Amino acid sequence: LYTEIETDDRKSGEKQFDYVDPRNRAVQIEMEKICTAHLKRIGAWLKPEFKDPDISELGVQEFPVTASVVIPVFNRIRTVKDAVESALSQKCDFPYNVIVVDNHSSDGTTGLLEELSLKNDNLIHVVPAKHDLGIGGCWNLAAHHEMCGEYAVQLDSDDVYSGPDTLQKIVDAFREQKCAMVVGTYQMTDFQMNPIPP
């Protein structure tokens, strides 16, 4: 494809959110064009033409709850408690649970989640049998878990919901739009919840 020599010597944490910096928009657009051209050249590009999802089964199949907040986690002792508590504090007109898939954390995350799950009946702490799942494998495990709800809603282990009605709004959007996926926005903050401008 191409070779790029790294000239940015900042630590990774300092450049973590460069992708949302408006000053980098031109580079992002250029990279998107390059990737699109490559996919077209190798016959792997998919035209953005999508059929409406088949929702005839919605509401027919039995689920243990309406929604599950899915949190994949690995070694996030500093942030996962806030994420879990944010999910557990949602106010909804439907039953929901929180499924945390702990990918064999070694920093105390596992013990913390075990403690939290003893105090919260709707918190399901899953440690997979396999050690090599990664974030996608953890997501897949949660989506196929017997306690997963009709709607699986992502929350990263270092994120919190912006308010107690966020989950309700997401499920309302699923229902009203009869869609297979809902994508929202987020606000970057520091650990004191102060917004970080792009």
Q: What is each model feature region?
A:
Residues 129-147:
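Glycine-rich, basic loop-to-helix element that forms the pyrophosphate-binding segment
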